[in-house]
Amino acid sequence: MLYFESLKDKFALNEKQLNKFVFYYEFLKQENQKMNLTSIISLSDVCYKHFYDSLILKEIFNFNTVTNLCDVDSGAGFPSFPLKILFPHLKIVIIESSLKKINFLKQLSSHLELDNICFFHQRVEQYDIAKNGSYDCVVARALARLELILKWCVPLVKKKGYFIAMKGKNFQQELEASKKIIKQIRVKLVSAKTLELPMQLGTRTNLLFQNE
């Protein structure tokens, strides 16, 4: 329980939230034996590379100021499911191209008693254009090059809403390559926060953009 206790201390989780993360890990480990959901499956790696990595977004953005969140290509639920556990008021929309991962997340949401989560089985570039401008905040984690995810994701964001791109340590190169699209779609980089995961498990940079 050491890794879970460190999450509890870092993010001020209550016992109910902590128990949800414990179940999340056990269910992920169980279902991953049946289908390939993630290559990251050890307890320490899941706690820090998945849970911690998702929850740390609260340091770059105040999720209490928004009501809905769109997670693009969520995979096994990161970062939206950890954020939903921490911020239960959020209405979550997940766009995911893998049907098996959607089915996993539907089961998980039922087990964790997480409500107000909608799932769309499709690629983000094929997502219903009528829903453009629908979301207070959109987030994408390890989806594609920054210039591509800006092109795909920012149109989903409301005017004056926010987009969070979760990137690695080489974000500066991607940011430089994205100057043209940033100007074209009229989005502003508000903040860039680089952090080291615990136990030297990697470097992350979270980029916060505002749709102008």
Curated annotation (Swiss-Prot):
Keyword rRNA processing: yes
Annotated localization: Cytoplasm
Domain of life: Bacteria
Entry keyword set: Cytoplasm, Methyltransferase, rRNA processing, S-adenosyl-L-methionine, Transferase
Keyword rRNA processing attributed: yes
EC annotation from Swiss-Prot or TrEMBL: 2.1.1.-
Residue numbers binding S-adenosyl-L-methionine: F78, E96, S97, S98, V124, E125, R141
Spans through the membrane: none
Gene Ontology MF terms in the entry: rRNA (guanine-N7-)-methyltransferase activity
Enzyme class name: transferase
GO cellular component, one term: cytosol
Homology family: Belongs to the methyltransferase superfamily. RNA methyltransferase RsmG family.
HAMAP family: 16SrRNA_methyltr_G
Chain's role: Specifically methylates the N7 position of a guanine in 16S rRNA.
Descriptive protein name: Ribosomal RNA small subunit methyltransferase G
Organism: Onion yellows phytoplasma (strain OY-M)
Lineage of producing organism: Bacteria, Bacillati, Mycoplasmatota, Mollicutes, Acholeplasmatales
Gene name as annotated: rsmG
